[in-house]
Amino acid sequence: MDTATLQDAMQGQDVVYANLSGDMARQAESIVDAMHAVGPKRLIFISAMGIYGEVPGEKYRSILDPYRDSAALIEASDLDYTIVRPGWFTREPEGPYTLTQKGEPFEGHDISLDTLSGLIVKIATTPGLYVRNSIGVSNR
């Protein structure tokens, strides 16, 4: 991910939304560097449930390493981040959801894409909401 291209895209933006795959740690570093260079402080970063070993009955799996490593880079930054750790995606209609904080057991398993989208918009448009937090989200 080219930092200069990110800087151009971030010009004049208040919020940066990142939902990535691939070399997530490198991409997270590029995002943090670009945000420092250009000025936006607010980052909404999509990760995955289980990155802290917080899913009851599930062992941590190495497939989550890119999500955990990129979240650690974001958490070490001085940005006003929110890391969102969704459950498995469904195409169900929007509905009520449960949030869990880092260090709490993850509740539920699935999250509808409509519900997740609504939460992301709420976070992006509500100053201070879940700033410097990592939240798990699943349908009730």
Q: What is the predicted function of each stretch?
A:
Residues 3-7, 13, 23, 36-42, ...:
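Oxidoreductase cofactor-interface core, primarily capturing Rossmann-like NAD(P)-dependent enzymes
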Residues 16:
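Receiver (REC) domain switch-region micro-motif
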Residues 20:
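Glycine-rich, N-terminal phosphate-binding loop of Rossmann-like dinucleotide-binding domains
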Residues 25-27:
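Glycine-rich anion/phosphate-binding loops
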Residues 30-34:
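A short acidic, amphipathic alpha-helical/loop segment
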